[in-house]
Amino acid sequence: MRTFLRFSFVLLLTTSLSGIASAQTIALTGQVTDRSDRSPVQAIVSVLPNGTSKTGTDFQGRFSLEVRIGDSLLVEAFGYGSKRLKVTSSQPLAIALAPNQVDLGEVVVTGYGSSTKKEMTGATSVVKSEEITKLNIPRMDQALQGQVAGVVINTNSGSPGGSTSIRIRGLSTFGDNDPLILVDGVVYDSEGLNALNPNDIASINVLKDGTASIFGVRAANGVILIETKKGQKGGAPVFEYASYLGVQQTAKRLGLLNAQEYAVLKNNAFLNGGQDQPFANTALGVGTDWQDAVFQSAMTSSHSLSATGSSNQTTYSIGGSYFTQDGIVGGDKSNFSRYNGRVNLSTDMTSRLRLNSVFLFTHEERKTLPENGIGSVLFNTINAYPTEPLVEEDGRYSYLALVSDIINPIAQMANTYNQTGVNKFVGKEELAWTVNESLTWTNRFNYNYALVDGRVFSPLVWYGPGKAQNTAVNADLDAPMVTLAEGFSLERGPSVYQHRDTYGDLTFESYLNYDRTFGEDHHVKATAGTSVFTRQGKGLGAWAFNIPNNSWDYADISASQAAGGYLNGASSFFFEERLLSAFGRAEYAYKSRYLVSGVLRRDGSSKFGPNARWGIFPAISGAWVISDEPAYRWAQTIDFAKLRASFGVAGNDQIPNFAYRALLNGEGVYPFNDLLTPGVAIGRASNPDLKWETTRQANLGLDLRIRNALNITLNAFEKR
């Protein structure tokens, strides 16, 4: 009875208020369309500030809503920027929405969780797959060049498959400045990025400021989070094939002297020095264009095939690719090729338990030439004088005899043999249990294994009299004699160096994610977990001399004909490192416009001395979504405005393993009873107090979106 009376009273009160308001309201009509093509848009039109009065458009984009003159309206549609406007008359409205350039509700992967762009309080940048695939690039990290503010990609090598250096907000240390790179949660180094097919990348998220402290002792140089493409539920399987074939050429060459210009200039120099002119006839024409001889057109091609789809419980994304690239210097002697296979699976084992699996296999082969600096092919190319031919009349390569440290670059390429092969296996097994609507427990095991085989062959070569690069004593390719000890000499012929190295990473992580909204105004998120990381590397290398027939075809250490094997040798290495971590993060949002986040991580690393192994890395950040304020007045021009601030402490553990231990170095070789015996000496003292570098970073940022078309991000930071 009491319920009925209460309902009757509310109904009576509502009816009375409606009757009073009806005298002051108008029936406003209008249509919402796409600004680009004027097609109808299904949208929600609500009255501000509280939005309790709202309506939706029909399939033609039309709506009708009871409003009052002076009311402010908010028009929202999925995939479009919102629009605010004021009611000034009863005339029908024509509202055009612009497609979102940046969807503020888009989910972005962060450390051990995810967030929407609107909720993020740190300085981050995201590159999507659409921006990557249109670039036709061989390496994933090249997608960041010019795409992300504060990120600089330095090319260490211009040859195919060459490495790059990624720098986020400049240099942080005199040591290793490489950022932490995670692909689907698996740790990669910058060299390992060669294994990825850029067409498989779904997104790249760059963490630039102190909020990267969730990754603790490895986050001082920034963090790059890469997600590969995954299957989507619903719909038929989708097959994609992408291919391109290209030709590469040098865009610009140096303006060097031709033969006649060189002869005239050199004659004048000798004349001014009171010496006889070296060229009796300077009418030599163009002569040899060494750049034209060395630089050539190089082919590159890429093919990739992928299938994406789902069944009742499983989504999948499967892909394979092939990429090859010749060098514009050296052709197939400077080549890179890559075969890649990838499988991403996500299976709902129960309604609350999900298994995510990632498998990646890559085979790479790379051939290289001497590069970067004195003695490289390009150094010899630009310093070779144009008055000398490529090949003499007797068929041998010209010696370039006038300068002792310059050799014929064509001969250099012909006698260079340097080949490396890599097999890489990467995977992740992740089990996510949805405990309830607010709590998820994730456990994952990652592995990253690489097998590297390399071979370098050094034949007997004669580049000309006085050349330091000669490995033979004369043009007849006679081998030099090497004195190992007094009265003990051996012939040193062509040599080969071979090595096999293995590297393996294992990671186990377990963490809880809590996400709950209290009432309409309070949103709380929290993460807590632990991580165990171990890395091991080992390798064995050997070199051998006197390879038969001075030929690459026989370049194997087993074929060595060195007398007694004295010239031959071997080397090895081994290292192991471990990292134990505990981490936590708490986030709070009030009315989705006042945001605050705190991070705390504790790391223990085996790289540091026993007195300084553990460190604590905190961070705090906050944001204010100004455009969500009821009194915000610039909505028609600046659709979105957010002010951010953050401060965090991160560490850097990029130092050699065992650096805190004493080191013995090999010193000298001595003959004892006709046996050659190496000596040792202390090369480095121990340091049990060796610890990580610490970086403190403060950041103040502003995010703006103007007229749903122009996105502006401003950051001011101090990093020390």
Q: PLM features: residue spans?
A:
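Short, small/polar-rich motifs associated with maturation and membrane association
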Residues: 1-342, 354-356, 427, 462
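Residue-level recognition of beta-strand termini and adjacent short loop/turns
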Residues: 69, 89, 350, 434-436, ...
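Membrane-embedded beta-strand positions in outer-membrane beta-barrel channels/transporters
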Residues: 94, 141, 165, 223-225, ...
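Residues on the lipid-exposed face of transmembrane beta-strands in outer-membrane beta-barrel proteins
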Residues: 228, 241, 258, 305-309, ...
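Surface-exposed loop/interface segments of Gram-negative outer-membrane beta-barrel transport/assembly proteins
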Residues: 233-286, 328-334, 340-424, 444, ...
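Transmembrane beta-strand segments that form the barrel wall of outer-membrane beta-barrel proteins
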Residues: 243, 322-326, 596-605, 647
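Long hydrophobic segments that form regular secondary structure
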Residues: 437, 693-719
